């Protein structure tokens, strides 16, 4: 704003950029292009509108390979009566809960689905993932639960299952929690020679969690916390959230048949509880590859990203991953590690680094060293000093960035290098 006239707005973009922006908005309005935020890195991606619709339709037609060799669709087209049936079932369960004193009148009114609408399907694109020039990057499907019939019951469910989803030993809350775990490992003394840092990614976790299996795991986990109502009431709400995930795309209604959507509130906690079981199975499996001792010094997981310190051989690590991909019919893993395939396993030279969260981890002198990691596609979008934001906001940006570097980088060499 002009300080001489607070009622007069002054654009902070050059004229040619404003004209280009207006042209893009016009093209999007006319359905020539679509503009979407990137999955990560704060950038945007501009796609041909028809190419975007085709990508979404292809995903909605995708199928999951079953253990018997058959294929089952992830989604199915439905009609409006299915939406009405979902509302009726939710309302019936809530009325019964109100009569039994499980919920208050205010909670009943807040969760009433009568005026709610279907969810909304869209895709975000993983420009940070490898893809050929000119090709559409891999997509991440999102079903927005905002305003949806299960929105408020899912909030209610999340309030309770989040309390138990953080209790398993492999749980990582965020980067500071990861830093604390690494500091603890380093305080225990040098790592064994030829230790390997490993990052494991779960492929399409949310859409591959079997609904009935996930519900059983949640119901069992709820025994570990105190609830003001029977746990069956909470799992019934979760079941309705999972099995009536109805959404709209391109003027058609769909029902998700397999897995859960990233856009619903309990999805991260639900996935965490499911993966806690997989964590235990995986670590039990790893004991077979330890040559007398358990080869995993550390196993920590942030949702679908797993960090491991492996003290066994490289061959056994690959054998472990091969068997890991057999422990569950729908959950599959990919791996990255700090040992170059062409490097002699006895070579004690510093290993390459692997990214995990927003850190880059390597081993130096048998200790874990951390550096700041940014994806190559990160746009580093920060406020300009000419922005109309309060001065303390813009002044705090360089301090926050410097503090992040100091907090993550574990040695002076990584803190002081140019970025």
Where in this protein do the model-derived segments appear?
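Charged structural interfaces that engage phosphate-rich ligands
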Residues: 1-419
């Amino acid at each position: 704003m002009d300080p001489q006239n607070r009622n007069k707005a002054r654009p902070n973009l050059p004229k040619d950029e404003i004209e280009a922006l207006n042209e893009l908005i016009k093209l999007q309005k006319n359905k020539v292009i679509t503009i979407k935020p990137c999955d990560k890195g704060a950038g945007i991606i501009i796609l041909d509108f028809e190419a975007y619709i085709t990508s979404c339709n292809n995903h909605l037609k995708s199928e999951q390979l079953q253990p018997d060799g058959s294929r089952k669709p992830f989604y199915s087209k439905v009609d409006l009566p299915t939406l009405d049936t979902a509302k009726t079932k939710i309302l019936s369960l809530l009325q019964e809960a109100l009569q039994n004193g499980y919920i208050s009148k205010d909670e009943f009114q807040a969760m009433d689905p009568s005026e709610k609408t279907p969810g909304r399907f869209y895709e975000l694109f993983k420009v940070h993932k490898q893809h050929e020039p000119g090709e559409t990057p891999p997509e991440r499907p999102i079903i927005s639960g905002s305003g949806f019939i299960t929105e408020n019951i899912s909030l209610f469910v999340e309030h309770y299952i989040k309390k138990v989803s953080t209790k398993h030993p492999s749980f990582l809350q965020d980067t500071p929690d990861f830093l604390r775990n690494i500091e603890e490992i380093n305080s225990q003394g040098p790592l064994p020679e030829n230790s390997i840092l490993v990052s494991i990614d779960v492929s399409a976790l949310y859409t591959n969690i079997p609904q009935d299996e996930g519900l059983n795991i949640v119901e069992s986990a709820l025994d570990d916390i105190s609830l003001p109502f029977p746990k069956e009431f909470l799992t019934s709400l979760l079941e309705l959230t999972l099995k009536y995930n109805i959404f709209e795309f391109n003027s058609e209604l769909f029902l998700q048949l397999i897995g859960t959507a990233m856009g619903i509130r309990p999805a991260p906690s639900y996935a965490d509880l499911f993966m806690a079981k997989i964590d235990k199975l995986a670590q039990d499996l790893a004991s077979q590859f330890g040559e007398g001792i358990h080869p995993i010094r550390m196993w920590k997981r942030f949702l679908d990203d797993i960090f491991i310190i492996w003290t066994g051989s490289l061959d056994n690590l690959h054998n472990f991953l091969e068997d890991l991909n057999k422990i569950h019919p729908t959950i599959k893993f990919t791996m990255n590690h700090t040992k170059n395939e062409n490097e002699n396993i006895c070579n004690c030279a510093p290993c390459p680094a692997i990214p995990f969260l927003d850190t880059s981890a390597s081993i130096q002198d048998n200790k874990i060293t951390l550096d700041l990691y940014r994806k190559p596609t990160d746009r580093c979008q920060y406020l300009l000093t000419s922005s109309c934001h309060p001065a303390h906001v813009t002044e705090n940006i360089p301090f926050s960035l410097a503090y992040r570097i100091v907090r993550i980088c574990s040695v002076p060499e990584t803190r002081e290098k140019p970025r």
